[in-house]
UniProtKB/Swiss-Prot annotation:
Complexes and interactors: Homotetramer.
Regulation of protein activity: Allosterically activated by GTP, when glutamine is the substrate; GTP has no effect on the reaction when ammonia is the substrate. The allosteric effector GTP functions by stabilizing the protein conformation that binds the tetrahedral intermediate(s) formed during glutamine hydrolysis. Inhibited by the product CTP, via allosteric rather than competitive inhibition.
GO terms under cellular component: cytosol
Residue span of region Amidoligase domain: 1-265
Protein name, UniProt field: CTP synthase
Major enzyme class: ligase
Gene label: pyrG
Length: 541
C-alpha cells in the first residue's frame, strides 16, 4: 500500500521544493522504506525538451528517454532511484491526453471540463506505475496562488479525501524572511500562504519554513497556532553550506519523525553515515582544483545543474574542492584563450545546440590538446573535439557540422537512423523538433586497452543520450591517423560514442551525458578520473 506525500510551495518560487522532496525521500529511504519521487509541472509545454535553457534550466533525461524537469536529477542523486517517464507530467501533456480521449470518443459525448476530466487525468498519473513503493512523494511545481497550478491542487485535494489521512500527507514549503530594519523574522507571509492553500481545501500537515537563521520557539508556536499544525510539525529549513547537508539538517529538525508519526509508523532511526561522510569530505578537502567550463548558457547556471554536481562528486571521490570557472565560449572567438584557460587544471566543454559560440569551444579544445591540459568533452563537446582534430590535425580546414549549415567536410551530421536493441529507429530532419532526438539509455562497447575501458573497468556500458547530431564515421580513418582514437562505439559499430587521445594526460570526448548518472555516494567514474587528472595537473599529488 503506497502512501502519498504532496509537497507544495508558497510565498515565492525557487524556495527549493525539489531539494526538500529529495532530502525527505533520502531520509525515508534511510529508515528502510522504498520511495518514489515525482514532479507535477503546471506549465503548458508538453515537456521541457524544446524550452530555452535560459527559461527552464537543465533538461534531465531518464533511462527510458523522457525529457524532464531538473528536479528529477535531485531525486536520483539523493535516493539513487532511477527516474522514469512516468515520474514527470506537465499541464501540456495532461491536456494533450484529455483532448486525444475526447477526439476518440472516450468520454461518450460528455462536456469535457477541468473537473472531473482534467483532475481525473492528474489523479490517474499520480497513482500510475507504482508497485511495492512504501512512499510516493509528489512535488507540485509553481507557487500556491498561481492560476496554472489550480487543477493540480484540486486533484491532490480529491486524492486526500479519497485515500484518507492514513495514506496521504500534505507538506507546505514557505518563506520566513528576516527583516534587518526590524531585527526579527516575519511569520505573516507563511500565514497568508497557508490561508491561500486552505482556500482550495488543503490543510497542510507539516510546514517547512525556509529561513537563514534559527526560528525562535515563540515564532514556531505562533506559526503552528495560526496555521493549525502541531508545533513540532513546523520545521525550520535552514540555509546550509552544501545541499548534501540538507538530509542531516532536516533529520535534526525532526522532519522524518513527524512523517512517521503522521502515518503511524514505527520505523528505525535513519542511518545517515554516508551523508555525514560526504559532508565531512566537502568541509575538509585535502586540496583544490579549478575546472574551466566553456559553455554558452552560463548566465543561468541551472542549465548545467547535473554537470556541476557531477564535478563536485568527482571532487568528493578525490577529497578535493572543485572550483568552477564558468566561461562564455563566445569570448574565445575573439581570442583571449590563454588568459582565461592557463590558470585552470582541467577544461570541460558541455552539451549545447547551435552555432553561437561553437568555434570558441573549438579554440578551447585546441588549447587543451596542445597544452596537455586534461580535457572532457560532453555531447557537443565531443563533436567540437572532432572538428578541432579534423581542422588542425587532419587538414580539413573547413570541417564543420551540418547543424551550422551546409559544408564540404561535415565531420558531424544529422542522424537519421540507429539501432535500439533489435529495433531500427528512424528520424526525419523535417520532423517535430521534440521528436528528432536520440534520447535515453543506449549501450556502448569500449575498445580493448583504451583509457575509458580502464576507467569503467568493463567492456560494455549504458549511458544516457540527448542529441540529434553525431560524428561522421566516414572520417574515422583519417582522424585516427592523427592520434584521435574512436574508443567507444554503439554495439552495431555504426555510431561513435567516445573519442580519446591516448598520447595525452587525459583527453576524452563522449557523445552521451555521464553527469546524469552521477551521485554523491556513487560518483561517475569519468568524473572521478577527470578530477584525478586535474589534481595531477595542479601538482597536488
Amino acid at each position: 500500500m503506497t502512501r502519498f506525500i504532496f509537497i507544495t510551495g508558497g510565498v515565492v518560487s525557487s524556495l527549493g521544493k525539489g531539494l526538500a522532496s529529495a532530502a525527505l525521500g533520502a531520509l525515508l529511504q534511510a529508515r528502510g522504506f522504498k520511495v518514489r519521487l515525482r514532479k507535477l509541472d503546471p506549465y503548458l509545454n508538453v515537456d521541457p525538451g524544446t524550452m530555452s535553457p535560459y527559461q527552464h534550466g537543465e533538461v534531465y533525461v531518464t533511462d527510458d528517454g523522457a525529457e524532464t524537469d531538473l528536479d528529477l536529477g535531485h531525486y536520483e542523486r539523493f535516493t539513487g532511484v532511477p527516474s522514469r517517464k512516468s515520474d514527470n507530467i506537465t499541464t501540456g501533456r495532461i491536456y494533450s491526453n484529455v483532448i486525444a480521449k475526447e477526439r476518440r470518443g472516450d468520454y461518450l459525448g460528455a462536456t469535457v471540463q477541468v473537473i472531473p476530466h482534467v483532475t481525473d487525468a492528474i489523479k490517474e498519473f499520480v497513482k500510475s506505475d507504482l508497485t511495492d513503493e512504501d512512499f510516493c512523494l509528489c512535488e507540485i511545481g509553481g507557487t500556491v496562488g498561481d492560476i496554472e497550478s489550480l487543477p493540480f491542487l484540486e486533484a491532490i485535494r480529491q486524492l486526500g479525501n479519497e485515500l484518507g489521512r492514513a495514506r496521504t500527507m500534505f507538506v507546505h514549503l514557505t518563506l520566513v524572511p528576516y527583516i534587518p530594519s526590524a531585527g526579527e523574522l516575519k511569520t505573516k507571509p507563511t500565514q497568508h500562504s497557508v490561508k491561500e492553500l486552505l482556500s482550495v481545501g488543503i490543510q497542510p500537515d507539516m510546514l517547512m519554513c525556509r529561513c537563514d537563521r534559527e526560528i525562535p520557539e515563540g515564532d514556531r508556536r505562533k506559526i503552528a497556532l495560526f496555521c493549525n499544525v502541531a508545533p513540532d510539525a513546523v520545521i525550520p529549513a535552514l540555509d546550509v553550506d552544501s545541499i548534501y547537508q540538507v538530509p542531516i539538517s532536516y533529520h535534526e529538525q525532526g522532519m522524518d519523525a513527524v512523517v512517521c508519526r503522521h502515518f503511524g509508523l514505527d520505523a528505525p532511526l535513519p542511518d545517515l553515515k554516508r551523508w555525514s561522510t560526504i559532508v565531512d569530505r566537502i568541509r575538509q578537502p585535502e586540496g583544490e582544483v579549478t575546472i574551466a567550463i566553456v559553455g554558452k548558457y552560463i548566465s543561468l547556471l541551472d542549465s548545467y545543474k547535473s554537470l556541476a554536481e557531477a564535478l563536485h562528486h568527482g571532487g568528493i571521490a578525490n577529497n578535493v574542492k572543485v572550483n568552477l570557472n564558468w566561461i562564455d565560449s563566445q569570448i574565445f572567438e575573439q581570442g583571449d584563450v590563454v588568459q582565461h584557460l592557463e590558470p585552470c587544471d582541467g577544461i570541460l566543454v558541455p552539451g549545447g545546440f547551435g552555432e553561437r559560440g561553437a568555434f570558441g569551444k573549438v579554440e578551447a579544445v585546441r588549447f587543451a590538446r596542445e597544452r596537455k591540459v586534461p580535457y572532457f568533452g560532453i555531447c557537443f563537446g565531443m563533436q567540437m573535439a572532432v572538428i578541432e582534430a579534423a581542422r588542425n590535425l587532419a587538414g580539413y580546414k573547413d570541417a564543420s557540422s551540418t547543424e551550422f549549415g551546409p559544408c564540404d567536410n561535415p565531420v558531424v551530421g544529422l542522424m537519421t537512423e540507429w539501432m535500439k536493441g533489435n529495433m531500427l529507429e528512424k528520424r526525419a530532419a523535417s520532423g517535430d523538433l521534440g521528436g528528432t532526438m536520440r534520447l535515453g539509455a543506449y549501450e556502448c562497447d569500449l575498445k580493448q586497452g583504451s583509457r575509458v575501458r580502464e576507467i569503467y573497468g568493463q567492456g560494455r556500458i549504458s549511458e544516457r543520450h540527448r542529441h540529434r547530431y553525431e560524428v561522421n564515421m566516414g572520417y574515422r580513418a583519417d582522424l585516427e591517423k592523427t592520434g584521435l582514437s574512436f574508443s567507444g562505439l554503439s554495439p552495431d559499430g555504426v555510431l561513435p560514442e567516445i573519442v580519446e587521445i591516448p598520447d595525452h594526460p587525459w583527453f576524452v570526448g563522449v557523445q552521451f551525458h555521464p553527469e546524469l548518472k552521477s551521485k554523491p555516494f556513487d560518483p561517475h567514474p569519468l568524473f572521478t578520473s577527470f578530477i584525478a587528472a586535474a589534481v595531477r595537473q595542479s601538482r597536488l599529488v
